[in-house]
Amino acid sequence: MADVSIPVSEPFNAKKGSPYNNGGLAPRAYDDAPQKGHRVHHCLNFIVRLLTAMASAAALTTMVKSNQGPARWRDFWAFKWFIIANAIVLTYSTLAALASLLGEWTRRGPLSSTPLAWLTFLVDFLLANALMSAASTATAISWVGRKGQPNAGWEAQCVAVGGFCRRVLGALIASYIGWVLLALSTILAATAIHRLRRRSAVAN
């Protein structure tokens, strides 16, 4: 008995690049997404990355310029770690923002494939934890300098170096804002992974 092949007609509104017009190949996981939804996702990711870079830059700059008399950030390992962590987040967020902007135009950004989305998620997660670690240790030192520790005989120092303490406080606030934005980037990456896995399951 001869094989009978049943032709499948493509919809009348099938566009170029759609699952019905890709040369008979299986639909790709992310390229099948509506262009508008794809661009909105990458645009939101770009905005969050840019704001994260700005917050980290503000925290880094404020801490570096916080010196007042004998009070210097170089004398505290917690503040050194704070600057290193924010510098790493600033560099990463800037590069990630550029990648997101490129992905919005080319549809080949960091959230366009499952491996890249997983890598983005893991890096965001690790850097968010590192930034929280740096901010929390710097907050502890700042709190002791502002309030002192009577049981240990440590007196508050911010009365003598108020400008230093105010600038450190500003840097801490900016860093915590950067952490919130970085956590939001992690959520966006997790959302992209979910969407990619769902489309891959539908395609299979």
UniProtKB/Swiss-Prot annotation:
<dbReference type="InterPro" id="IPR006702">
    <property type="entry name" value="CASP_dom"/>
</dbReference>
<dbReference type="Pfam" id="PF04535">
    <property type="entry name" value="CASP_dom"/>
</dbReference>
<comment type="subunit">
    <text>Homodimer and heterodimers.</text>
</comment>
<protein>
    <recommendedName>
        <fullName>CASP-like protein 1U4</fullName>
    </recommendedName>
</protein>
<feature type="transmembrane region" description="Helical">
    <location>
        <begin position="115"/>
        <end position="135"/>
    </location>
</feature>
<dbReference type="GO" id="GO:0005886">
    <property type="term" value="C:plasma membrane"/>
</dbReference>
<keyword id="KW-0472">Membrane</keyword>
<feature type="topological domain" description="Extracellular">
    <location>
        <begin position="65"/>
        <end position="81"/>
    </location>
</feature>
<comment type="similarity">
    <text>Belongs to the Casparian strip membrane proteins (CASP) family.</text>
</comment>
<feature type="transmembrane region" description="Helical">
    <location>
        <begin position="82"/>
        <end position="102"/>
    </location>
</feature>
<feature type="transmembrane region" description="Helical">
    <location>
        <begin position="168"/>
        <end position="188"/>
    </location>
</feature>
<feature type="topological domain" description="Cytoplasmic">
    <location>
        <begin position="1"/>
        <end position="43"/>
    </location>
</feature>
<keyword id="KW-1003">Cell membrane</keyword>
<keyword id="KW-0812">Transmembrane</keyword>
<feature type="topological domain" description="Cytoplasmic">
    <location>
        <begin position="103"/>
        <end position="114"/>
    </location>
</feature>
<feature type="topological domain" description="Cytoplasmic">
    <location>
        <begin position="189"/>
        <end position="204"/>
    </location>
</feature>
<feature type="transmembrane region" description="Helical">
    <location>
        <begin position="44"/>
        <end position="64"/>
    </location>
</feature>
<dbReference type="InterPro" id="IPR006459">
    <property type="entry name" value="CASP/CASPL"/>
</dbReference>
<keyword id="KW-1133">Transmembrane helix</keyword>
<feature type="topological domain" description="Extracellular">
    <location>
        <begin position="136"/>
        <end position="167"/>
    </location>
</feature>
